[in-house]
From Swiss-Prot:
Functions as a component of the DNA-binding general transcription factor complex TFIID. Binding of TFIID to a promoter (with or without TATA element) is the initial step in pre-initiation complex (PIC) formation. TFIID plays a key role in the regulation of gene expression by RNA polymerase II through different activities such as transcription activator interaction, core promoter recognition and selectivity, TFIIA and TFIIB interaction, chromatin modification (histone acetylation by TAF1), facilitation of DNA opening and initiation of transcription. Residues 193-261 form the Histone-fold domain. GO terms for molecular function: chromatin binding; DNA binding; RNA polymerase II-specific DNA-binding transcription factor binding. One of its GO terms (cellular component) is nucleus. Residues 106-126 have a biased composition (Basic and acidic residues). TAF4 heterodimerizes with TAF12, forming ultimately an octamer consisting of a TAF6/TAF9 heterotetramer core flanked by TAF4/TAF12 dimers on either side, similar to the histone H2A/H2B/H3/H4 octamer. The 1.2 MDa TFIID complex is composed of TATA binding protein (TBP) and the 14 TBP-associated factors. One copy of each TAF1, TAF2, TAF3, TAF7, TAF8, TAF11, TAF13, two copies of each TAF4, TAF5, TAF6, TAF9, TAF10, TAF12, and three copies of TAF14. This is Transcription initiation factor TFIID subunit 4. Its main location: nucleus. It comes from Saccharomyces cerevisiae (strain ATCC 204508 / S288c). Pfam families: TAF4. Keywords: Coiled coil, Nucleus, Phosphoprotein, Transcription, Transcription regulation. The modification Phosphoserine is found at residues 36, 49, 80. Present with 1900 molecules/cell in log phase SD medium.
Length: 388
C-alpha cells in the first residue's frame, strides 16, 4: 500500500486519496462546468472519444488488480470528469463509460423548446388549478352564503331589490316610449268645412277651408270656447235658482216673545170678562154666531186639505151635515163659506214650485239673454216651448 501510486485529482484541486472511499454523489450546489453555448463547443473538442474512454477504463481496472485492490468502487485514473452529476455508483459510471454512445450536449433550439414546454406545462397547471378551484367554489355555494350572512348581508333581499329596480327601470322605459295622442278637435273638420262652404255660398263668397286646415282648427276652438262660456253661466244660474232660503230656526228675539205673551194675556182677560157679564145677566150668549164660527172653521180646514192634496173631488166625510145652499144668491149660514162657494174652481190654488235638479231650459235661456248676436229666434222658441 505504501508503494501505491498517487491517485489523480478529479478536477477540483483535491487528490483522490483525500476523498472518502465510498462517495456516491457529487454536490449539486457547484456545477462542474460552464455549459454556455461558447464553452460547449470548446468542451466537445477537449473531451476524449469513446475509444479512449474504453482504453483508459481497461487500464485503470488492470492497475487496481496489480496493486491488490479488489474493490470496484475506486474512481478511475487519468479520466476527465463527466458532466453527468447524478452518479449513484462507480458501477454506473463504468457502464456509462462503456456505452458506445458519446455525450450529448444541449443545443440552442433544445433550450428554447424546453423553456416553451415548461412554460406551457406551468400555464396548464395554473389553469387546471384555477378551474379546479372555480369548480369547487361553484359546487359549494353554501360557504359563500354563510360568509355573507355573517357579514350582515341577506342575499335574498339583495336579489329581490335588484329585480325590483330592474322591473322599475323597464316600466319607466316603457312609459317613456308610449306616445300620447294629440288633442282631438271639438268639432269634426269635415263637418266644419261643409258648413263654412255652405255659409260662404249664401254670402257669395268662395271659400275653400280644406286648403288651410288651420282655419278649421281655429273655428273648432272658437266654438268650444263659446259653448263652454254658455254652459258655465247656465250652471251658475241653476245653482242660484236651487239655493235654499235660510230659515231662522234659532231662538227669536226677546221683543217678539214679550209681545206674544202680552197678546195671550189680553185674550184670556177678554174671555174672563165676557163670562162674567153673561153670569151677571148683562149680556146674552150668541149661539148663532158660535155655530157659524165653528162651521166656517170646519169648512175652511176641509178646503185647505183638498187644495193641499190637489184633488177636486170632495168626499162626504169632509163636508159638514149643514144643508148646502142651492144657488149662489141663496142665504148662506156663514160669511166665509159663502165667499168660498162664490169663488168656486176659479179661485186661486196653492201649489209648491218644483225645482228641477241640474240645468233646465230656463237656465239656458237666461244665459243666452246676455248674448246679443243671433239669439233672438232661439230665445223666442225656447220660451214658447216652456209655455206649452
Amino acid at each position: 500500500m505504501a508503494n501505491s501510486p498517487k491517485k489523480p485529482s478529479d478536477g477540483t484541486g483535491v487528490s483522490a486519496s483525500d476523498t472518502p472511499k465510498y462517495q456516491h454523489t457529487v454536490p449539486e450546489t457547484k456545477p462542474a462546468f460552464n455549459l454556455s453555448p461558447g464553452k460547449a463547443s470548446e468542451l466537445s473538442h477537449s473531451l476524449p472519444s469513446p475509444s479512449q474512454i474504453k482504453s483508459t477504463a481497461h487500464v485503470s481496472s488492470t492497475h487496481n488488480d496489480a496493486a491488490g485492490n479488489t474493490d470496484d468502487s475506486v474512481l478511475p485514473k487519468n479520466v476527465s470528469p463527466t458532466t453527468n452529476l447524478r452518479v449513484e455508483s462507480n458501477g454506473d459510471t463504468n457502464n456509462m463509460f462503456s456505452s458506445p454512445a458519446g455525450l450529448a450536449l444541449p443545443k440552442k433550439d433544445d433550450k428554447k423548446k424546453n423553456k416553451g414546454t415548461s412554460k406551457a406545462d406551468s400555464k396548464d397547471g395554473k389553469a387546471s388549478n384555477s378551474s379546479g378551484q372555480n369548480a369547487q367554489q361553484q359546487s359549494d355555494p353554501n360557504k359563500m352564503q354563510d360568509v355573507l350572512f355573517s357579514a350582515g348581508i341577506d342575499v335574498r333581499e339583495e336579489e329581490a331589490l335588484l329585480n325590483s329596480s330592474i322591473n322599475a327601470s323597464k316600466s319607466q322605459v316603457q312609459t317613456n316610449n308610449v306616445k300620447i295622442p294629440n288633442h282631438l278637435p271639438f268639432l269634426h273638420p269635415e263637418q266644419v268645412s261643409n258648413y263654412m262652404r255652405k255659409v260662404g255660398k249664401e254670402q257669395n263668397f268662395n271659400l275653400t277651408p280644406t286648403k288651410n286646415p288651420e282655419i278649421l282648427d281655429m273655428m273648432s276652438s272658437a266654438c268650444e270656447n263659446y259653448m263652454r262660456d254658455i254652459l258655465t253661466n247656465a250652471i251658475v244660474i241653476s245653482r242660484h235658482r236651487r239655493k235654499a232660503v235660510k230659515i231662522n230656526s234659532g231662538r227669536r228675539s226677546e221683543v217678539s216673545a214679550a209681545l206674544r205673551a202680552i197678546a195671550l194675556i189680553q185674550k184670556k182677560e177678554e174671555e174672563r170678562r165676557v163670562k162674567k157679564r153673561i153670569a151677571l145677566g148683562l149680556e146674552k150668549e150668541d149661539y148663532e154666531n158660535k155655530i157659524d164660527s165653528e162651521e166656517t172653521l170646519h169648512r175652511a180646514s176641509n178646503v185647505t186639505a183638498g187644495l193641499r192634496a190637489g184633488s177636486k173631488k170632495q168626499y162626504g166625510w169632509l163636508t159638514s151635515s149643514v144643508n148646502k145652499p142651492t144657488s149662489l144668491g141663496a142665504k148662506s149660514s156663514g160669511k166665509v163659506a159663502s165667499d168660498i162657494t162664490a169663488r168656486g174652481e176659479s179661485g186661486l190654488k196653492f201649489r209648491e214650485a218644483r225645482e228641477e235638479p241640474g240645468i233646465v231650459m230656463r237656465d239656458l235661456l237666461f244665459a243666452l239673454e246676455n248674448r246679443r248676436n243671433s239669439v233672438q229666434t232661439i230665445i223666442s222658441k225656447g220660451y214658447a216651448k216652456i209655455r206649452d
